[in-house]
Every structure is written in C-alpha cells, then in structure tokens.
Amino acid sequence: MSNILQSVPVNQKVGIAFSGGLDTSAALHWMRQKGAIPYAYTANLGQPDETDYNAIPEKAKAYGAELARLIDCREQLVAEGIAALQSGAFHISTAGVTYFNTTPLGRAVTGTMLVAAMKEDNVDIWGDGSTFKGNDIERFYRYGLLMNPALRIYKPWLDDAFINELGGRKEMSEFLIKSGFDYKMSTEKAYSTDSNILGATHEAKDLEELSSGMQIVEPIMGVAFWRDDVEVKRETVTVRFEEGRPIALNGVVYTDLVELMLEANRIGGRHGLGMSDQIENRIIEAKSRGIYEAPGLALLFIAYERLITGIHNEDTIEQYRESGRRLGRLLYQGRWFDPQAIMLREAAQRWVARAITGEVTIELRRGNDYSILNTVSANLTYAPERLSMEKVEDAPFSPADRIGQLTMRNLDITDTRHKLAIYSSAGLLTGNSSVALPSFEKDKK
C-alpha cells in the first residue's frame, strides 16, 4: 500500500516544510483553499542567506497555517557534520577537490527533526517542496518514515490539480496576488541555491550547461576568489582537535560547536576555500552538476586529514578512506541513519577519530590554494629520526637488517616472475601494449 497521497487530504492536518519562499507560500495557501488544514514547520539550519527566521512562521500563518513552528536544527546539523568529517563520509570529488555532502546532511536533520515535531502535534501527513526528478524526494521519504511509520506523504508537486493550476513561478505569484497578498516575485537568478550552516549548493537553470562556469555564481559563504578585483590576503590559521573533535581556532576554545562552525566559515570564506564544481550521479543514476561551498568544513577537513596521515598507519588510513566513500554514498542516498551507515560511522569515530588530538597550522590563499605550515600532536607516529639520512645514535634498524628484509622479498619476486612468464607465453604481455615490456622466461628447475 502506497504512503503517497495524490490529491489534497481534505479536513486533515497536513504538515509542510515551510521556507517562506514562493513555492511553499503558494502551496500552503492553495492547500488551505482546497480544504486541508496546513501546519507549517520551518527548520532553522543556519542558512547564511536567511536574515529573519522569526518572521517565517508569521508569514505562514498569514497564508493560512493553522499552526506555524520554528525548529532550531543548527546544533544537530553541526553534530552530524562533524560525524561526517570524522568518518570521511565524502564520496564525490574532482581532482582531489571534495564535495562535503552538505545538502544530504541537511536533509537528514530536517527530515527527522521536522517529522518529530509533527508527531508532537499529531500531524501524520507531510509535504515539502522536493520535485520528482531530484534526490530530496527520496531522502525526505526515507527519513520521514523512519521517524513515523504511520506517516503519509502529500506533495503538491505530485498532484496534477496543483500542477495544472500553479505549475510555474508566474502562476504562483499571480495566485497570491489575486488572493490579496502583496507578493512581489524576486528577480529570478540564473541558478537555484540551497544552503545551511555547513555549506551551499548552487545548481539548475544556467548551471545545467557545462559551458557555464563557476564564474556565474555569486558566493553566499565566501568570496568570488576568481575575480581580479576581489582582494584576498594570505592568512595563517591554527586548528586544534581533541579526540577527533574540533575545539579551537587560532587558540580560541569553543564549547559551542555551532559558534566554532560559524567562525570556521568566516575564516575559510574570506578565501573562497571549499568551493568546487562537481558532476555527480543522483540516486536515480542520472547525472547532475552543482557548484558547492563549504568553507568551514573544508578548513577543518584539511587539519583533520593532516593529523590522520601523521597518526595512523597505512592500513587504517586505507580502511578509513574506503569506508568513508561507502558511507558518503549512503549519506547521499538518504541512508545516514541506516544500520550499515551507523556501523561504518561509529567504527571510524571510535578507531580513527579518537586518536586525533593535535594542532595544524595552515596558510590560506585564494580558493583551495593553501599550505600546511606545522603539525603538532603527542600521538604522531611520524618520527623523522627513523629514516634520517644522517648518522644517528641507536638507529632503529641497520644495513644488515635491511639486507635480511630484502632477501625475504625473493620469495614473492620469484612467484611474480613465474606468473609473468606464464602470461608472456600466452601472448598477454605483447601486442596491444604501448609500453615495451621485458621478456620473461620461467625459472629453470
């Protein structure tokens, strides 16, 4: 049996994730006119482009909401962002520049906290502004049903009646004006933006064309570092971690992680740090393109990964990165709270993050251009004296030790040479290869 309603649930409470924008304003008022009883829930995610959160619930009431609530999600969102950082839950990157899954993290928090608030008000029908082509419709569906198994979904954008009457921005604006609201449609940008305290996503419209570069975007969390008229000064910043948690920036200790993230955003934003241009695979396997900002997470991630490479061994780092990519995909798919994701996340937090204590000093320049100036930690296993080219007292190993180690390598070298001779006899090492390979012969018995 489907949980999705395809027409307005008349005389029933309908919770709507209300942003105060044109889409949700028109949808809320239209639902009220059609006989639904809308309840509006607004998530305070620390969006950098939102100036007055308290005005949003009042706006919802004016459009016909029976009840309008503002839910502060910032603390939970930052906590989930730090958990993603600790576990390296980022699977999308281009040439080493990372997308920090900031929108999927926002959806995980919004989807769970708003539905929890709806349950308090005995609201078991939920709607939001996600379209059928995107990722969010599935993310919200999963998180909503995880929080409330009795939840039913009503999305105006899946209702033919709504689409036929108010299928575009022009129609929605005219509808509100005819209903007596002094609504002025904002100038439409060349792309759409979605943001929270962790980062911003710019996509769609002109950005769907790969010939439109990052230069058409006006950053909301940082500076347009690619412009010659934008001055960006070098800046040195020190980031301190304690058992995997960021606790200090430039010597200032933060007990409130929200305040720490805001300051990290300000520091990274002054340089345009963390901006990236990514082509990605949506949940439905169609490709999309986005321009992303995440100045604070990018700053923290540089320091965190520097400490990881200085503290952990190769096998641990490999496991952390492989598990992180897998976890990043689960997060992207709306499975952040699924058992397989919790298993990967908690393993990284316990066995990787717990050892990460120390300070990293970084020089920031333009965009993602930076240098690491110093790394300090009592947990470092980096010990230059072990490999020093100078003569040292009590060397950890001698030339004779290395001779013995190399002699042991003869075992697998012999096996490898034997296999290559088999492949050579079969003609597998000649022909199509553009590289001249040596001729191999089997060892004579």
From Swiss-Prot:
CDD domains found in the cross-reference section: ASS
Pfam families, per the entry: Arginosuc_syn_C, Arginosuc_synth
Keywords: Amino-acid biosynthesis, Arginine biosynthesis, ATP-binding, Cytoplasm, Ligase, Nucleotide-binding
EC number: 6.3.4.5
Catalytic activity: L-citrulline + L-aspartate + ATP = 2-(N(omega)-L-arginino)succinate + AMP + diphosphate + H(+)
Pathway: Amino-acid biosynthesis; L-arginine biosynthesis; L-arginine from L-ornithine and carbamoyl phosphate: step 2/3
Binding site residues for L-aspartate: 131, 135-136
Enzyme class, UniProt record, top EC level: ligase
Binding site for L-citrulline: 99, 135, 139, 192, 201, 203, 280
Gene3D superfamilies: 1.10.287.400, Argininosuccinate synthetase, chain A, domain 2, HUPs
Cellular-component GO terms for this entry: cytoplasm
N-terminal signal peptide: none
Keyword Ligase: yes
InterPro entries reported in the protein's UniProt record: Arg_succ_synth_type2_subfam, Arginosuc_syn_C, Arginosuc_syn_N, Arginosuc_synth, Arginosuc_synth_CS, Arginosuc_synth_type_1_subfam, AS_cat/multimer_dom_body, AS_multimer_C_tail
Subcellular localization: Cytoplasm
Positions of ATP binding: 17-25, 43, 129, 131, 136, 194
One of the record's GO molecular function terms: argininosuccinate synthase activity
Family: Belongs to the argininosuccinate synthase family. Type 2 subfamily.
Quaternary data: Homotetramer.
PANTHER family: ARGININOSUCCINATE SYNTHASE (PTHR11587:SF2)
Protein name: Argininosuccinate synthase
Gene: argG
